[in-house]
Amino acid sequence: MRPLRPLLGPLATGTALLLALAACSDDGSGSDGAGGAGGAGGERSGATSAAEETPEGPAVRTDDSDDHADQVYVAMGDSYTAAPGVDPAQGDSGVCGRSQVNYPSLVAGAFGGSTLVDVSCSGATTADLLGSQQLAGQTFPPQVDAVTADTDVVTLSTGGNDFGAFGVLAGQCEQPGATCPTLDLATAQAGLARVTTDLVAVIGAVRERAPQARVLVVGYPQVVPPGAEGCADLPVDGELLGLARLLNEELVNAQQRAAEQAGADYVDVFAATEGHALCSDDPWINGSDFVEAAPYHPLPAGQRAAAAEVISALDG
């Protein structure tokens, strides 16, 4: 993992950049974009993916063994886990926007006989895994409350909504003629450090409740492309695009550090989604329209890619 390098002045960010990294909405619309990618791009460019690609995207294999039969699987996370807008929705998901074909559902479906408890919710921060979440006038209990002594597997993925500054920036920059605030390096570094610290605390709380459970931190996919050119769905370029990519990578590094420090497994979705960021020929991240997924969130193919990596990790 490369360290967060100096960023040539403040991280001045525009609307598309912030939406892609962490749109941080708390209105349940799914625009909370847990921004980020699953690892440092430079380190993982040669990594292999567990997903076999088809013309429709990655395939999710089924597991015919009894290794995971009767297991209880708890999924915790934000909208990148819940998958708002990826139809059909879970009947009880409400404003959290959980999909019946998000990666936790696909993983549970691949392991016949397992029980899924999906408490992921749009807008969730890492703090919401341990404390209650306020969303659209409703209060949701701490996600960790779903973990009990009989839980066998826990996946968790948060951090993209932890930067309160991103929510402020996205909200203000969306207004016509508004001046976008800036996020300085110290704020970014402190926020990334908190992501790691808070995720370590969550993993510890999970282990207290279910000492025997397998805990996996699921990294974010590649959202921002490498290079210096944006596109219609990400209309920034040059230095600004580079800063977005750097934050994309560093957020995931923070997730990976937490997994390593707490002795949990890390699922590298960043490597699995190489070549499928925004502006690519075959993006697995939705653009600005609410089509097939919430804006700037994983498309069904992105959910399948994450599921394939989780399945591979559990079978490893």
Where are each of the predicted segments found?
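Short amphipathic alpha-helices and their capping/turn segments at secondary-structure boundaries
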Residues: 57-72, 136-155, 200-214, 311
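Oxyanion-hole/transition-state-stabilizing segment in secreted/luminal serine hydrolases
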Residues: 84, 137-190
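Surface-exposed cleft-lining segments at the edges of enzyme active sites
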Residues: 181-196, 240-244
